[in-house]
């Protein structure tokens, strides 16, 4: 294992030796030093000891410190050599980096590159690296540099610790403070951002690996399950959304702000709620919010799948359509035979569309509207509805196109629209589009002839989709799906 200390060196004038040394303490370790970098370096050498030595000291020097004749480095080199000799420590290898005359951010880029290359050179011989950061020295703008450096090195997976020398000029005493927590807070911020931007809880689990709070542990478990549900497009997303809401509330109520720095995750809870549209009564709007979140974060395949898995439930549970089961229950239950219970609401809607199909083509006055005589009179009434409902595998895919013509005049008795028929037509058209788009994404192939006919019919009915026929891109699918979500929300708003 290799230990590397990185310091931004503060200028130290010879006349300060006359002012006397400071006594710095950290728990059971006490060191005497005139200069803050000296204090941190002596503390770290003492803490590591002779057996677990400090191997390399990377020293970032400003122009003032590096100027010929300056006393700073002369003093530090001599004092550390003396200190190591007296205590049986090995003097670390020095690697000096000079800020130079570059414009501020250019020199930061150069210095970061030099330090990164040196650390990688050391890691080539021994990848087990621990980085120690001396936060006590340098000019004020070096804090920005240290933050950038910490972020850069953390991506390599190194263990990082930070220290600050806090002195009382009146009493000539000071404390060596471990400032690891500030970087842990940054890890939490990054982890929460990873969750709200990409739906991943892996970084959160790592950031809170040592937290003992039952509420936080339960929240992390729920966030991981929620993340899995999004990634796998699971059907239990509504349940996971409700559980996440409950666990966020538990942390808000029962976790002390100051316990183990957990205030940071509490501070991020409003962001989590906002990004995922989480509220105590999310329901269908919560699912719509998650689909929208997927679209906003480039998860188009997940958005299409989650939408398709939930659209029937939203339409039925939100009562956009009402079905009198006394009238239609027997037929629907027969269609449900051998189907999974989760398909119940989808089956109800397919049944309604099938009856609309029947009513449309039993009407002698209905125009064909062309398009190959309305798709070959719906493929000869879908082979007479596959022998009049005799086979449960009849082609739902073909007759759901009836949704495009969905009009209250075709509704069977006992079925009622609770939103305007034009809006309902759009919602069914959206759902048809989402199926076509998902099939194309999942199968990684071009849409087939029948889907082309469907999209052409959409366009004839003045409801064009950006993604078809020749512009099937994530950007255009996202645009079409956002419009689909807007239509659903309009329907929910009009119903309330």
Describe each region flagged by the PLM:
Residues 1-130, 145-496:
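Long, low-complexity, Lys/Arg-enriched
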Residues 133:
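Conformationally flexible catalytic loops at phosphate/diphosphate-handling active centers
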